[in-house]
Every structure is written in C-alpha cells, then in structure tokens.
C-alpha cells in the first residue's frame, strides 16, 4: 500500500513537509529522483513513463497513490503516472487540473492524486 503524509503551511520555515513511500512491484523498472529534461524533479516509472511524485521549480507539486480494485480493473487503462507529469508540465492551477481530470478519470485504474502550486493545494 502506498502511503503519503504531509503538513501544509504549518511550519514557519517549510511550506510542505512530506513523508511518502511507493509500494510497487519489486520487478517494475524505475529510475530514482533526478531532474528530467523538461525541468521537473521526480523518480521515473520506466515501464509507464510517468512518475508517482514530483515537483517543478515553478512551485508545482504532485503526488499519486494507486489503489487496486480487482473487480473494476481495466487492463487497457492509461498509465496513472501521467497524471502527475500532466499537472507538473501543464499551465493549469490545481483546481482547474482536477476539474479537467474529472472528465477522464474513468480511463484510469483507481488512484488518489494530490496537486499543489505555491499557495493552492
């Protein structure tokens, strides 16, 4: 099970304090935290091409946890890692991005997505 715990705007020095783990299949290929060519900082899922957690120097942050629901599994679903990179690389605010995502969420298997930008979470 993936876990994510955070504190937002509660510390005088740090806007975001985050503790997270990625509980994925051990044989799923990944690359550790690094700066991508497009400027974001994140690990990379080498199978799906996306990420589960990342930030952009412009102040954007996104994190994803998956949840498995065998009764509603979609074998041909889109990779959930693109949800994080889509927000980080896009121009939409967190609220606008989630509103847009509402229209296509059925294309993905189960997930929880946290997005933030400077003052908006």
Regions found by a protein language model. Give the residues of each.
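N-terminal nucleophile
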Residues: 1-121
């Amino acid at each position: 099970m993936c876990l994510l715990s955070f504190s937002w705007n509660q510390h005088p020095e740090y806007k975001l304090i985050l503790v997270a783990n990625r509980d994925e299949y051990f044989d799923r290929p990944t690359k550790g935290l690094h700066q991508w060519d497009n400027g974001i900082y994140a690990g990379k899922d080498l199978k799906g091409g996306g990420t589960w957690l990342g930030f952009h120097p412009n102040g954007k942050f996104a994190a994803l946890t998956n949840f498995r629901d065998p009764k509603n599994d979609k074998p041909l679903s889109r990779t959930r890692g693109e949800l994080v990179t889509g927000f980080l690389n896009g121009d939409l605010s967190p609220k606008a991005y989630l509103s847009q995502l509402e229209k296509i969420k059925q294309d993905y298997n189960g997930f929880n997505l946290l997005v933030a930008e400077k003052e908006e979470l």
